[in-house]
Amino acid sequence: MLWTNCFSNILPLRENYIGLNEYSSKLLENAVNELSRLPGIGKRTALRMALFILKEDSLYADNLSKALVTLRNDICFCERCHNISDSDLCEICANHKRDELTICVVEDTRDVIAIEKTTQFSGVYHVLGGVINPMEGLGPNDLTISHLIKRVAEEQIKEVILALPATVEGDTTNYYIYKMISHFTTKITTIARGVAIGDELQYADEITLGRSIVNRLPFAQTR
């Protein structure tokens, strides 16, 4: 009975209690909210990041801010392969030591980075900017497929390597590209299935991905 009376007195006070901001600072809360919008970053991680920035000297915060603003405002896309770049041509396309007649078709920049880490590919790339996905409203015209077709038709490409994710959407895109370019080039290959079904290339380890590229197969044999 005594405990009941105690809680009955406390609960009304709790209902009417107006506490401080959850983070004790609106500025901190705003920083946490913005950081938590990043992929894979929850509120706890965002708070840890914000507090880390606060503990560092002001120069670090200034450099971070400048790097992000510069990234957003100054970065561009390679006019040839659509990879992110600091200039009209990315470093790979501008490198004359690369095999310009072998194109590796990938979904996005992360795949370029992953393949480059394997050191098993010396050709050039074509970044689609996604895969065909009707559920998300992405069709062939929303990607850079038409430019890929133009490259293959005009540059006498000797091999096109299809290195898209081993998903339904990736396979659909592979097949669509195959049908569109098969009369322009005789050699269309796909990476070997060392990468597990459903896995994205950037999550595969370098050895597995490297072997998949080296052991690539004629696309027609995988149908």
For the regions a language model picked out, list residue spans one by one.
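Long C-terminal interaction/binding lobes of large macromolecular proteins
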Residues: 149-223
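Solvent-exposed alpha-helical segments within well-ordered globular domains of core cellular machineries
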Residues: 29-33, 47-51, 62, 66, ...
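Conserved nucleotide-binding/hydrolysis micro-motifs of P-loop NTPases
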Residues: 86, 97-98, 109-112, 131-134, ...
